[in-house]
Regions:
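Short, positively charged patches
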Residues: 1-126
Length: 126
């Protein structure tokens, strides 16, 4: 459960953010709305089942074990997570509507401030 994050973001909150975004029926827009409403992903995860009942949908968080495996795989690959509200998140990317809430990156992040080319992929490609 070691999700590297900015010091202002606890490991528990970093893990909860990854878990929230990886949960079924939670995309970047609903993720942002839940964080805004509850202030923390830990609180949003606790509220998911009740929100689903009231909305006539079933919302369940992805099992923590799946996220633990992902985090471990990212760590073993030498990569790290960067959240949309952390220092170092690319400023131009942040301006895009629907910008990814979480980036998984490897290498020297400070180079992103210079002109560059990025390769971007989706976990759930259509």
């Amino acid at each position: 459960m070691n999700a590297p994050a900015h010091p202002a973001l606890s490991q528990e909150e970093a893990f909860a953010r990854i878990r929230l975004l990886r949960s079924p029926n939670i995309g970047p827009v609903s993720y942002a709305m839940l964080l805004q409403r509850f202030g923390a992903a830990t609180e949003a995860l606790e509220a998911l089942p009740d929100l689903g009942k009231r909305g006539g949908r079933q919302y369940r968080a992805i099992p923590a074990e799946k996220v633990e495996r992902e985090v471990e795989s990212v760590r073993k690959g030498g990569a790290k997570y960067l959240f949309h509200d952390q220092p170092g998140y690319p400023a131009l990317l942040r301006e895009i509507e629907g910008a990814p809430p979480i980036l998984t990156w490897r290498g020297e992040l400070s180079l992103a401030a210079r002109p560059c080319v990025a390769i971007v992929g989706a976990r759930n490609a259509s």
